[in-house]
Amino acid sequence: MIACSGPRGMVKIEPNGNEAAPEDSLEYELIVMDPGFETWYMLQNTPARYRSQEYYEGWNQQYVSAWNYLATQPGRRSFFQTIMGYEPGEDYGFELNHKLFYYFQYVEQVLRIPILDHRPVGVVF
């Protein structure tokens, strides 16, 4: 499970509570506690903009690494309070990786809180 909290709310990645799922097919769910994100995400979430799961995983690894670094820096902790436990080798699936990637875009572009020095090229909002 990962959780990140800030003045706007909290983000969690946790196993989905589906008890009937076999152990080898664990599903995860991303929960964002910022109502502004959900509305924004619905407007941005169009299949014409989809990239591959590998694309989102690559960017998410960079964003999580930067997020975790910022969470350990004095003065930056007001927004980046919690370390994210996103594991590079774990298969979180397309939907979760897509939504997490868009959460990072929301933080940078809507909330105007920089995370990475460089951004994905060709991502238009």
Task: Give residue spans per PLM region.
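Compact alpha-helical subdomains of small soluble proteins
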Residues: 62, 70-125
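Secreted/periplasmic serine-hydrolase-like ester/acetyl group-modifying domain
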Residues: 67
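Bacterial Sec-dependent N-terminal signal peptides
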Residues: 1-12
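Acidic/histidine-rich, surface-exposed loop or edge segments in extracytoplasmic proteins
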Residues: 40-53
